[in-house]
Amino acid sequence: MSKFKVIEIKEDARPRDFEAFQLRLASPEKIKSWSYGEVKKPETINYRTLKPERDGLFCAKIFGPIRDYECLCGKYKKMRFKGVKCEKCGVEVANSKVRRSRMGHIELVTPVAHIWYVNSLPSRIGTLLGVKMKDLERVLYYEAYIVENPGDAFYDNESTKKVEYCDVLNEEQYQNLMQRYENSGFKARMGGEVVRDLLANLDLVALLNQLKEEMGATNSEAKKKTIIKRLKVVENFLNSNLNANTDSDEAVPNRPEWMMITNLPVLPPDLRPLVALDGGKFAVSDVNDLYRRVINRNTRLKKLMELDAPEIIIRNEKRMLQEAVDALFDNGRRANAVKGANKRPLKSLSEIIKGKQGRFRQNLLGKRVDFSGRSVIVVGPKLRMDQCGLPKKMALELFKPHLLAKLEEKGYATTVKQAKKMIENKTNEVWECLEEVVKGHPVMLNRAPTLHKLSIQAFHPVLVEGKAIQLHPLVCAAFNADFDGDQMAVHVPLSQEAIAECKVLMLSSMNILLPASGKSVTVPSQDMVLGIYYLSLEKAGAKGSHKICTGIDEVMMALESKCLDIHASIQTMVDGRKITTTAGRLIVKSILPDFVPENSWNKVLKKKDIAALVDYVYKQGGLEITASFLDRLKNLGFEYATKAGISISIADIIVPNDKQKAIDEAKKQVREIQNSYNLGLITSGERYNKIIDIWKSTNNVLSKEMMKLVEKDKEGFNSIYMMADSGARGSAAQISQLAAMRGLMTKPDGSIIETPIISNFREGLNVLEYFISTHGARKGLADTALKTANAGYLTRKLIDVAQNVKITIEDCGTHEGVEINEITADSSIIETLEERILGRVLAEDVIDPITNSVLFAEGTLMDEEKAKILGESGIKSVNIRTPITCKAKKGICAKCYGINLGEGKLVKPGEAVGIISAQSIGEPGTQLTLRTFHSGGTASTDLQDRQVSAQKEGFIRFYNLKTYKNKEGKNIVANRRNAAVLLVEPKIKTPFKGVINIENIHEDVIVSIKDKKQEVKYILRKYDLAKPNELAGVSGSIDGKLYLPYQSGMQVEENESIVEVIKEGWNVPNRIPFASEILVEDGEPVVQNIKAGEKGTLKFYILKGDGLDRVKNVKKGDIVKEKGFFVVIADENDREAKRHYIPRESKIEFNDSEKIDDANTIIASAPKKERKVIAEWDAYNNTIIAEIDGVVSFEDIEAGYSADEQIDEATGKRSLVINEYLPSGVRPTLVIAGKGDKAVRYHLEPKTVIFVHDGDKIAQADILAKTPKAAAKSKDITGGLPRVSELFEARKPKNAAVIAEIDGVVRFDKPLRSKERIIIQAEDGTSAEYLIDKSKHIQVRDGEFIHAGEKLTDGVVSSHDVLKILGEKALHYYLISEIQQVYRGQGVVISDKHIEVIVSQMLRQVKVVDSGHTKFIEGDLVSRRKFREENERIIRMGGEPAIAEPVLLGVTRAAIGSDSVISAASFQETTKVLTEASIAGKFDYLEDLKENVILGRMIPVGTGLYGEQNLKLKEQE
């Protein structure tokens, strides 16, 4: 940043361009130099002559003439007197525009504080003087005295408490001290003057050094905080001239006394105008009233002082003056705002600039535009993709200047006046010229709300009659438009550059893909889908079936002559191959480009298939082919939707016959459940849940029945079925409401009403049912309204935080990346690896796990084909470049971003990716739900909540798993964490018996086997191995990673597997709870039926070392007995198409070298066809088991006090149950005393049932007690939009879990102040201590090993903790998977990279931990870029650089903390931002979009990026 020259802004010559913008405090001299005269009178204009009063607020002498080049009295009129000052009225002859820029001033009799620097926290004046804000206000408003010189004064008679400099005294203290110490130099005053003097006398440098010393001396955190606050303000003042030019007067740093105002600037009058309304009234800007109050009070004060009025009156007047100035700057900051004549508070200068209606957002960021119009839209089915219909009347207005020029050019009119007359009369020549003007001149259409870039697109206008704009049906999806009265705005681009941009970038035929996901957005919908679907249907036995046709022409003739039905199955030749198809599908084929393969069109085409077709055509054929293809598709769809004559009638709605039976059955079940509840066998929560389950399943059964009926009806040509099946309109759920039953309804609070609506719409609803229905409908409407506002606000915050992210360079050269794998939630896949990798650049080579060769090199851009190969290769995780790890100085580099999804190519420098990301995330916000879901208070009984079973084949490995045998001989899991059951297949087997050795060298892990004679080594990549914390389920996923079952130094037998690939894993406690029963043994094979999955030839292999040896003598019916058996399916070129591992005990179903189909089962499991269950447990209770043998004793467990006795009626057994509410300090505990002095303690939760008695002898693994899971209070799951905004705002959750910061062993220490103390001791001797509230449920046990990042208590993981403990990459994984879960759950596809861009902005600031020799202060939040620049500067000078840690800021905080003053001020908290910036003399280098829009410069993206790099041309030698 070289030294900038200050640009003087002159009235007539405004600077064309500038490089930076600085905010500073203005000194009184500066204000005077701006002023053109003092405003002395409060008058505005003379009500009779309507001329401004002299010396008043609108005075022409000070501010300039009212009319152009004309003085007030009229002596000088005309241009030629420019610059002359009239002798009579004193007005300078000039352009009247100067009234917008000339300022005046008011000389205040007494200094007045600027309210921003007093009242906005932290109070700057107070901080500098070291006075509390409240006290400072008392001094300024003449209620208290401030000590100017303490002299030798003491507060008490014993002279112990000294009066300090800047102490604040009340009246009584002041009088007392004055009497005693007046002669010894004591002096105190009140009001603005003394504050100004105190500020003027401050020696900032000395204060700075003093504060730094104090900072070093103190140990108290609170003191440090206040010192740092003062330090910041002092440093800001001292550094406020760092970048100014040394020779100009700007070089003086800001002075503290400038925060007090002695000369008050007066705004130029045209910026606070008086507007004459009809009827002789005036509309006055509020600022004028506020100025009038200031002037009145100032003049009155002047008079009183000249008259030598009593002190008390003068004080009062000074206070009133201070209040008047306060109101002018920020009315309403103090308690009582000044009200105007109409009883509403006056709008002060602060209010004018802030808020939605303020200057920034209303006039600078959004302006009204010339050459624009709006009208209602109607559909224009005849238009081409890039056309829109523009009403002639509108075109006439919009293109008027062009038209005038055209009329003159063609000689139809000789003067402009004549041309205007012609246009008014609308002669034929006018229309002729209009056609020519409009041709080739695109217009832009925009539909509000403009949620993403596709809401503004360019079209070539076609002139139409009528008054409505015609819109192409396919672009409706992008605009989110429909034709129920929507309006759109038209804008005309004027400059050649704008026209070119419209034609090249914004034309609708260029915007086929959605920038959010890369899917095509111009997909036919509704009628068009229906037409094409109808065309592609096949009807058995239709007229002309099985005919042979030569081609499309013959088919069309046959259809015309009625001897062939459109749905008839026919045979024909395509590309020299005979195929069977239908007449309709051939018609579809006739509009397709030639390169579309048969399997894309020769089938029933539903909406998804049509979308895939469009995507395919775009990927293969490019823009032009796609645009014309879409138009043909649209025409075909509309034509056949019309010819099909599909309509809805009541007869199409078919009610299932056995509906009544099903309903009666359900009612019977409900009665039974109600009875069990009445008997007290089940809780009310269980009753409610079960009843709802019954009705849900009844509804599902009926819906299935009904769909079957509708599908069979008219051989699949039932109108309603066709609409739903094709995806044109409606869904199975809606049809089921029409034909089966309406189903369960929700109450306004989101809970489900347990009586369903049994009727359907065809039968009609009764009154009660109708009433229940209306709830839902109304809630829907209310929700939508709220949702729109919330989603809009989220978008605005995202835009603001990401607006400065753009692609600046091609490649930043980093080798760093983030490892990604598929995102799963509760075993369902949310986003596959293939989807996540698409359009990204690899940060590391991808190694094929089978051949060990490099599949894709580092730096490869993954397109669809490559992503598909990757998906099929079985690779589970890949390292990719991301915006978070990008090392570009500013912005992001193209390689770290990847493909620009809107056009499917690598992104180009200059692309505003930040804005696109924010739009992509914000735009679907309106489709997300608003609700937080309430989950009931009972445990659900799904299978997955009772057991886990293997889905793949292989053999079992236990990782760290300990088990106890109980009385029945079952194996019970004894670990509470850090253990897992793995399903693996072998990758390397030992060639001979020997000792294993494992060593890490850089990025490699070397596994060697050695006996007396020989040694072999296998090299693995470190990052392919599963890490301990991944195996324990703390972070990442383990599928496809390698596992080493042996440690160094162990003896290993021959043919033993020493390196294994993990196929599935179940960790304790997330997938297998503590005390579950394990049903498999370590090393046990797991057999499944294996389908081939590919066509080809079977070849069997066995693993030797790390290579495969061919085995040929394999026959059908063999049972595999050896580890490491594989089968490979080879394709016709003898390349490997697919490989399967065959576990031991599998039965082989085909001989070696036999040819098979992809659907054949090649390996059968042994007779038991059940899936292999790995573990199972009690679904309703958390079980507590004994870990040692011993004797039980009770602590704090007493019937009738902390527990109740229950008698089981069936068995007559008595058991104790812990009460739900316990007295404070009571902790029911079971203690088992074992051998010696070994004892284990178990704290019991409320509602726990105890199965043992005091003094019982028990054995290891016995069940002591069970806590019902239902007792866990029902949690509200935040979902939908609130969840997204919670994540982006990085809010600390209310019930955040405490998380371990280091790996280590847990120890419980003595409780401290009723908090539990947990200490984690790491192996290297470090330890971390945690104090945990009693209310939290602790999830760890004494003596357990725990990984960093695991929860110590229940609760939600806070994203701040993830960042602090596990680092940025883990945060990246956490945030993206959480946000994607919400969007994918609603069926919205957003590419990860958009979320990454926002996350990279949330991480753009760091917190200084140690400031070294830099200018930062400990605890400062600074942007990474500033931090890096400052450190580089210090290192160059040989100093000590600063150290910082990353922080995660919510999007609002990140946007306000922007490096750019203007963009932060225009976002939120305007006054606060401007206050800070002015004191520090902050520079805004105008690098981002928003500040350039505000200042009206070209924005630095796209072509504007190159405008910054001024190009110099040299002549060739």
From Swiss-Prot:
EC number: 2.7.7.6
Record: residues binding Mg(2+): D482, D484, D486
Cofactor: Mg(2+); Zn(2+)
Keywords per UniProt: DNA-directed RNA polymerase, Magnesium, Metal-binding, Nucleotidyltransferase, Transcription, Transferase, Zinc
GO terms assigned for molecular function: DNA binding; DNA-directed RNA polymerase activity; magnesium ion binding; zinc ion binding
Residues that, per the record, bind Zn(2+) 1: C71, C73, C86, C89
Any one biological process term the GO annotation gives: DNA-templated transcription
SUPFAM superfamilies assigned: beta and beta-prime subunits of DNA dependent RNA-polymerase
Binding note for cofactor: Binds 1 Mg(2+) ion per subunit.
Catalytic activity: RNA(n) + a ribonucleoside 5'-triphosphate = RNA(n+1) + diphosphate
InterPro entries: DNA-dir_RpoC_beta_prime, DNA-dir_RpoC_beta_prime_bact, RNA_pol_asu, RNA_pol_N, RNA_pol_Rpb1_1, RNA_pol_Rpb1_3, RNA_pol_Rpb1_3_sf, RNA_pol_Rpb1_4
CDD domains (alphabetical): RNAP_beta'_C (cd02655), RNAP_beta'_N (cd01609)
Sequence positions that bind Zn(2+) 2: C812, C886, C893, C896
One GO cellular component term noted in the UniProt record for this chain: DNA-directed RNA polymerase complex
Keyword Transcription part of the UniProt annotation: yes
Top-level taxon in the UniProt lineage: Bacteria
Family: Belongs to the RNA polymerase beta' chain family.
Assembly, per entry: The RNAP catalytic core consists of 2 alpha, 1 beta, 1 beta' and 1 omega subunit. When a sigma factor is associated with the core the holoenzyme is formed, which can initiate transcription.
Function: DNA-dependent RNA polymerase catalyzes the transcription of DNA into RNA using the four ribonucleoside triphosphates as substrates.
Protein name per the record: DNA-directed RNA polymerase subunit beta'
Record organism: Campylobacter jejuni subsp. jejuni serotype O:2 (strain ATCC 700819 / NCTC 11168)
